[in-house]
Regions:
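Short, glycine-rich, amphipathic interfacial segments at transmembrane boundaries or analogous
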Residues: 213-214, 220-221, 226, 280-322, ...
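Signature of alpha-helical transmembrane segments in polytopic membrane proteins
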Residues: 1-131, 433
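A short, structured surface patch at a secondary-structure boundary
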Residues: 314-376, 418-422, 426
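A hydrophobic, helix-centered structural microdomain
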Residues: 241-305, 340, 417-433
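N-terminal hydrophobic signal-anchor/signal peptide
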Residues: 1-16, 20, 124-261
Length: 433
């Protein structure tokens, strides 16, 4: 079933490429037949089919890489995969042109138009698929009510049954294609162990409950973590990625610097006019490895708002100034933190850094809280785009489930997802704190 879904997604992407190839021909040359001779993007006597073959090869490469990042779960028509597939397609064309320049020539306008239309068509067929029911049927074998509730509220999963691990009564028949999600911490009765074994022989997929939970909720089940869990987390494998991520952080920050300086000057003036006190607010935060650093922000509260010590910010915090309320709404108060990114205190994407006093408090009361410091904190993060406000310890625990998920699964694709959703967060004001 997994292979059929992957094949269907790839074939639909191929159809999107065909639409893009022909639409680009209409846009560039005014005809729907791009294989006709005499076009500007092929030399006399040169066929257009090598270009089409290279585009298909690039799309296949992107699809293969995407399929490897899905894990063991059912593939889903995600928008992020459309980005990676089309990007791979364009990169392969560029590499082909670079290495065989004398034998291969094409119109960059034509390829760009093909990529744009292909991307739009790929997004469209994914939107149609996501609008239809495509839930994965799952039977949960666990006592954990919280995990069951979270999965019952998660999109694209149907909890067809919740089975008692210690039950001695034989469970009823399950629909074909159902996945059995097994709580590995549960003690199984002999009849239940036999049922799971026979289900496996009958062709039902048996998967750890925590894996299903992570895939469908984007969170780590803290209740299932144990000391040494990071040994199963491929942190060593991400060292290369973290080094590359640092290069990207610096490059993007330098590119954004001119615009950031202009906006920063305007915001600085507005803050100084609006209320008394410095425009830039400095505060100690805890970063990677528990190291304390100075974080910079535009001041959004009245001067001296933290005189009584660290406090959670509230949705309608009375300490906010008029300009500060607007800055928080669009998150422009965090613009000076680009300097923290250049210094290496922050990454563009990662868990948000907390004040040291909060870190000390949560490290004592929340299991595994300090594991969020395994990586650099970020300007935006997985918890920010999924949860929003955290104004007490209970909310902090919920956000930690997202932070630890990011620590475990950090990747370029997840960062792109977070960036895209952060733009929506800025535009909508959701989670601005």
């Amino acid at each position: 079933m997994r292979r059929r879904i992957l094949a269907r997604i790839f074939l639909l992407d191929l159809a999107a490429l065909a639409v893009g190839f022909v639409a680009a021909s209409v846009y560039t040359f005014g005809t729907i037949f791009p294989w006709n001779a005499g076009f500007e993007f092929v030399r006399p006597g040169q066929s257009v089919f090598p270009l089409l073959g290279i585009l298909v090869g690039g799309l296949a490469l992107g699809s293969f890489v995407s399929s490897r990042s899905w894990g063991a779960g059912m593939p889903r028509p995600t928008y992020g995969r459309a980005v990676s597939n089309v990007t791979a397609m364009v990169v392969v064309v560029a590499l082909a042109e670079f290495f065989v320049r004398d034998q291969f020539y094409y119109s960059r306008t034509y390829v760009a138009a093909t990529a744009v239309v292909t991307f739009a068509a790929a997004l469209l067929h994914r939107a149609i698929a996501r609008a239809r029911p495509w839930n994965e049927p799952v039977a949960l074998i666990t006592h954990e009510k919280k995990l069951v509730e979270d999965l019952q509220g998660a999109p694209h999963i149907t909890v067809v049954d919740v089975l008692d691990p210690e039950s001695h009564a034989p469970p009823g028949p399950l629909p074909r294609g159902t996945t059995l999600a097994l709580d590995l911490r549960a003690v199984l009765s002999d009849p239940m162990a036999q049922y799971i074994s026979s289900s496996n022989l009958a062709g039902y997929r048996i998967r750890p409950l925590v894996d299903v939970y992570e895939e469908h909720t984007g969170r780590l089940a803290i209740v299932h973590l144990a000391e040494g869990w990071e040994l199963q987390t491929p942190m060593r494998a991400t060292q290369t990625f973290q080094s590359m991520k640092r290069v990207v952080d610096v490059a993007l920050t330098v590119l954004a610097a001119p615009l950031a300086l202009v906006l920063g000057m305007l915001i600085w003036i507005a803050v100084r006019i609006d209320s008394r006190g410095p425009a830039i607010f400095r505060q100690a935060r805890t970063g990677r490895g528990g190291r304390t650093f100075t974080l910079y922000k535009f001041r959004t509260m009245v001067d001296g708002a933290d005189a009584d010590g660290a406090q959670f910010a509230q949705v309608a915090d009375p300490r906010l100034t008029r300009v500060g309320r607007v800055l928080r709404k669009v998150r422009m108060d965090e613009l000076p933190q680009l300097w923290n990114v250049l210094r290496g205190d922050l990454s563009l994407v990662g868990p948000r850094p907390e004040q040291p006093s909060f870190v000390e408090q949560f490290a004592l009361s929340i299991p595994f809280y300090e594991h969020r410091h395994l990586i650099r904190p970020g300007l935006t993060g997985w918890a920010q785009v999924n949860y929003g406000y955290a104004d007490d310890e209970a909310d902090t625990i919920e956000k930690l489930t997202y932070d630890l998920y990011y620590v475990k699964h950090m990747s370029p694709w997840l960062d792109i997802n977070i960036f895209g959703r952060s733009i929506w967060t800025v535009l909508s004001g959701f989670g601005a704190q």
